[in-house]
């Protein structure tokens, strides 16, 4: 709840600062005020809808099935491990789901520490020793305990507000500077506005995604450290080493950011949701992020 309050106050502060700056430079108008409100609402609403529906969206994306009543020994074991770790860390027992995928993977999502979901792939259950699965689950439990899913979603909402407002505001200025007031020019102004706003939204959207992905990489180190605190550093290192042999995850990008194995081919680490596995292992060995 505190994160959501901070998010609301941050968005409000951003809009107020923009309003003051625009007034100082003499570009404050009813159109600009309307754009500020629309940008803020899109930033708010998009983030909140994504947050509230995160479990539903995640399950639909991977075809996961929630375990309500365990049907076999593996499901019994999985529920017991997650329950024990949740109690140890002091959070409400998450919902538990299994989804069919060959890669060794797991993810956590949900709107709060006490309303969350942990999902594991069949590939993880079939190909990883249980001691290492415990470490993977502890990694996801740490994400929930740290509130990482909520924070990443709220950061996305804030940067989306910036992207929408700045791109459309600059597009308005460009269209107004190029055009005039006759009818033919007004049609041209609209075209200029659409082209410029689209280009700027794409460009600023890339910059915004770099910010969100940086935060995601940063929090992965702390989730690894949290897992090491719960089950031991050796188990977490062994799990990460085994993930090197896994298939590339087949989940969608909005889910991949929450997976323990977010491997992806990229020209630059800037566009990766997870740090390279070797860096994560090195951080654990040196205790860089251990509390």
From Swiss-Prot:
Principal location class: membrane
CDD domains named among the record's database cross-references: M48B_HtpX_like (cd07335)
Binding positions (Zn(2+)): 139, 143, 220
Cofactor dependence: Zn(2+)
One Pfam family named in its UniProt record: Peptidase_M48
One cellular component term from this protein's GO annotations in UniProt: plasma membrane
Entry keyword set: Cell membrane, Hydrolase, Membrane, Metal-binding, Metalloprotease, Protease, Stress response, Transmembrane, Transmembrane helix, Zinc
Cofactor: binding details: Binds 1 zinc ion per subunit.
EC main group: hydrolase
Record EC number: 3.4.24.-
GO terms classed as biological process: proteolysis
GO molecular function, one term: zinc ion binding
The keyword Ion transport is assigned to this record: no
Segments traversing the membrane: 4-24, 37-57, 147-167, 195-215
UniProt family annotation: Belongs to the peptidase M48B family.
Protein name: Protease HtpX
The organism of origin for this protein: Baumannia cicadellinicola subsp. Homalodisca coagulata
Taxonomic path: Bacteria, Pseudomonadati, Pseudomonadota, Gammaproteobacteria, Candidatus Palibaumannia
Gene: htpX
């Amino acid at each position: 709840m505190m994160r959501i309050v901070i998010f609301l106050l941050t968005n409000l502060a951003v809009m107020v600062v923009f309003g003051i700056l625009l007034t100082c430079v003499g570009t404050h108008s009813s159109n600009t005020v309307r754009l500020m409100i629309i940008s803020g609402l899109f930033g708010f609403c998009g983030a909140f809808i994504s947050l509230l529906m995160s479990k539903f969206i995640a399950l639909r994306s991977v075809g996961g099935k929630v375990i309500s009543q365990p049907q076999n020994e593996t499901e019994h074991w999985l529920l017991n491990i997650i329950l024990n770790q949740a109690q140890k860390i002091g959070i409400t027992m998450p919902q538990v789901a299994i989804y069919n995928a060959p890669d060794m993977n797991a993810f956590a999502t949900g709107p709060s520490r006490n309303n969350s979901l942990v999902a594991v792939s069949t590939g993880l259950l079939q190909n990883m020793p249980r001691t290492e699965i415990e470490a993977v689950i502890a990694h996801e439990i740490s994400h929930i305990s740290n509130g990482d899913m909520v924070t990443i979603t709220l950061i996305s909402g804030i940067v989306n507000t910036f992207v929408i407002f700045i791109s459309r505001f600059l597009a308005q200025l460009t269209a107004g500077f190029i055009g005039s007031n006759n009818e033919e020019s007004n049609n041209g102004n609209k075209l200029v506005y659409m082209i410029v706003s689209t280009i700027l939204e794409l460009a600023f959207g890339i910059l915004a995604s770099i910010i969100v992905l940086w935060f995601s990489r940063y929090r992965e180190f702390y989730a690894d450290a949290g897992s090491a605190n719960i089950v031991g550093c050796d188990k977490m290192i062994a799990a990460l080493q085994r993930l090197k042999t896994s298939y590339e995850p087949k989940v969608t990008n909005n889910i991949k950011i929450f997976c323990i194995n977010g491997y992806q081919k990229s020209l630059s680490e800037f566009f990766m949701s997870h740090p390279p596995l070797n860096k994560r292992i090195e951080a654990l060995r040196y205790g860089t992020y251990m509390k």
